[in-house]
């Protein structure tokens, strides 16, 4: 891994720490069952909404295996489908357990800042934005594109905020509602650990020039900065606008001048 890619992974790690700070701020105060329903409904949406577009992509790409689509990439997409399905099931089961009510997709929340995150990702890779959010229409032609490799790798490096939410929730106390939350998100975290270096590995052969580095850093900052606003909204704004801006500024400072 070259020096510039190490700097990009450092940048993504700084944003992961910033995202963790938001989640920590929420859990710093005592919370009742009702306090958890909104953020869990939003998280369940994020997991569930990826299932259909990945399934559709797999069906469309199947005839292209070893022709236009590498079999290893196809396998990776099948693993992602399995993970997202499992994670959606875990979070929705948790919602039912806490609320005492049957939960279906119509009960989940797609919040405004998450919608904005989808739009920002779509500026750089419409196909990846669709796979991650379930928004838009996916096509085999879009997935086969070879002219947005850096963009896709940079987005991958930011995906899930580096597991920030899962990490914080997995470390909650072991009893009561928080104990149930901790168990579910620890299970999800274990799945995410296997993918944690995929963005860096994808960027390694692509970032060859200063322009490549600047492009990737710009995408990481834009996507990750919006992730902070998304996460703060999801948890009911535990941090003020100024506090959020300071987290963003500090994270960007991880690679001063991006050079």
Where are these regions (language model features)?
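Non-heme di-metal
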Residues: 1-259
């Amino acid at each position: 891994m070259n020096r510039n890619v190490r700097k990009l992974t450092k940048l993504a790690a700084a944003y992961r720490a910033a995202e963790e700070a938001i989640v920590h701020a929420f859990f710093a105060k005592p919370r009742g069952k009702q306090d958890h329903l909104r953020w869990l409904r939003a998280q369940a949406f994020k997991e569930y909404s990826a299932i259909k577009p990945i399934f559709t992509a797999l069906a469309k790409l199947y005839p292209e295996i070893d022709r236009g689509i590498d079999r290893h990439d196809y396998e990776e997409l099948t693993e992602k489908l399995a993970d997202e399905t499992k994670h959606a099931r875990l979070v929705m089961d948790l919602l039912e357990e806490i609320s005492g009510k049957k939960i279906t997709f119509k009960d989940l929340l797609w919040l405004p800042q998450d919608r904005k995150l989808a739009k920002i990702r779509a500026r750089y890779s419409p196909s990846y934005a669709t796979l991650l959010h379930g928004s838009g229409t996916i096509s085999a032609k879009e997935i086969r594109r070879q002219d947005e490799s850096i963009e896709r790798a940079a987005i991958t490096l930011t995906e899930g905020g580096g597991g920030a939410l899962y990490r914080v929730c997995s470390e909650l106390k072991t009893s009561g509602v928080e104990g149930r939350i901790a168990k579910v998100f620890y299970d999800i975290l274990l799945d995410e650990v296997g993918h944690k270096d995929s963005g860096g590995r994808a960027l390694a052969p692509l970032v060859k020039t200063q322009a490549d580095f600047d492009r990737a850093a710009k995408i990481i900052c834009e996507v990750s900065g919006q992730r902070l606003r998304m996460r703060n909204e999801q948890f009911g704004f535990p941090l003020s606008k100024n506090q959020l801006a300071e987290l963003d500024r500090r994270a960007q400072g991880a690679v001063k001048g991006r050079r």
